[in-house]
Amino acid sequence: MSSNEGGAWLALNIRGKLAALLNVFELDKRQNAKSRGYLVKNFVKGNSSTLEYLQELQGSQDVYNGFKLITINISKKSLETHYFTNFVQDEGPALKHIQNGVQGFGNGPFLKVAEGEKLFNDIVKKYGHSNHKDTLIKELLRFLKWNKLHYPDEELIKRTPKFPGTDDQKKFSSIFVEMPSRQYGTRTHTIILIDHDGKVEYNEWTKSGLIWNHQCYTTILKAEV
């Protein structure tokens, strides 16, 4: 998934390297900061491991506005995941190894992240088998379009002072964000399925006007076993 600045928010290559980038809500942004989109692109195109890449990044973290970056190396026998944030308010700068299992990440430590992680876990437990692939995709897409408001959320209120008590502030509290009056909101959904044989199904829905366009790609990972 590409960003407007030539980088990417999410990327996966056939060697099993995956990266996802989240911006964070922050009150004070750096002027002339470097584009964060290249953090994803450079990891996927490079040869560094998840840990090596983030360790290298630690030395230049201050030239970017706030972000969270998840890097994953996937093989048929293992999954290596690391997480880095340069945002001090979220206990950063922090570099962590992530254990296998269900993990939820968001633009901040919001209620919708915790509730979303629970619902995601329930869906995967119920449908996370190859026999239920179509149902799994359907339920995950429904989850990504979940517009329930998790409000009031004290952390969200603290980080969105420009919208005190407004409907827009409340709309930030849902998984699926939609603000037509501001031409702002969720524009892309991505679901990536990888089985034990390295077969990949990459589904992406992107909003264009009022239409959601769906693209599906399949491939096989060439990661080392």
Question: What spans do the regions from the language model cover?
Answer:
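N-terminal nucleophile
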Residues: 1-225
